[in-house]
From Swiss-Prot:
Organism: Bos taurus
Biased composition (Basic and acidic residues): 182-198
Gene Ontology CC entries for this record: extracellular region; transport vesicle
Lineage, opening ranks: Eukaryota, Metazoa, Chordata, Craniata, Vertebrata
Annotated stretches, region: Disordered: 71-241
Pfam families attached to this UniProt entry: NESP55
The protein's name: Neuroendocrine secretory protein 55
């Protein structure tokens, strides 16, 4: 009875297990367990990777802030860039002011060009009167200038006077005609002597030589000291009373 009862009990237990967990249900349960485990592992890996990225970003920020203290903020992340774009948009109305500044600069350049043109016109007006007087004397009659024939006449008169004078005759014996001819010359303006006349140039040279001979002072004649001079004799004895 016992031997027959044991296998019967085993069969009954199997039937009961199959009834509770059939083979199809077992396979589905195992698949669900594997899926849940894999999903949990993937989530853990994702969280660890995000944490590692955040740590690396924090380290980069601290490194950049340490080496670039002047920069207060580090380049933002892509999601924050949209907000920054919206922040930069209000700064666009500043463009008209910049255009106005350019317009003012152009007006300043125009005023400078006008000033330069005025200065050039003033310089031209200043230089114009300097050139005009040079052309005017050509058209208008100039001042009365003594004619050349008078100069030649005076030369001929002087030559004739020199010829009349003899080397032996004194200036007191000169004829009155020469004195009369010289008297009107004194009223006239002094004229330049022609250096070609050798006779006229010789006369003033001779007169200068005579004056030099007369005015030369006589040099004091010094007698040579005799061999018996007091300097060589020695000191003069002084008599004491």
């Amino acid at each position: 009875m016992d031997r027959r009862s044991r296998p019967q009990l085993g069969r009954r237990a199997r039937h009961n297990y199959n009834d509770l967990c059939p083979p199809i249900g077992r396979r589905a349960a195992t698949a669900l367990l594997w899926l849940s485990c894999s999903i949990a592992l993937l989530r853990a890996l994702a969280t660890s990777s995000t944490r590692a990225q955040q740590r690396a970003a924090a380290q980069r920020r601290t490194f950049l802030n340490a080496h670039h203290r002047s920069a207060a903020q580090v380049f933002p992340e892509p999601p924050e860039s949209d907000h920054e774009d919206t922040d930069f948009e209000p700064s666009l109305p500043e463009c008209p002011e910049y255009q106005e500044e350019e317009f003012d600069y152009e007006s300043e350049t125009e005023s400078e060009s006008e000033i330069e043109s005025e200065t050039e016109f003033e310089t031209e007006s200043d230089t114009a009167p300097t050139t005009e007087p040079e052309t005017e004397p050509e058209d208008e009659p100039g001042p009365v200038v003594p004619k050349r024939p008078t100069f030649h006449q005076s030369l001929t008169e002087r030559l004739s006077a020199l010829r009349l004078r003899s080397p032996d005759a004194s200036p007191s014996r000169a004829p009155p005609s020469t004195q009369e001819s010289e008297s009107p010359r004194q009223g006239e303006e002094p004229e330049d002597k022609d250096p070609r006349d050798p006779e006229e140039s010789e006369e003033p040279k001779e007169e200068e030589k005579q004056q030099q001979h007369r005015c030369k002072p006589k040099k004091p004649t010094r007698r040579d000291p005799s061999p018996e001079s007091p300097s060589k004799r020695g000191a003069i004895p002084i008599r004491r009373h």
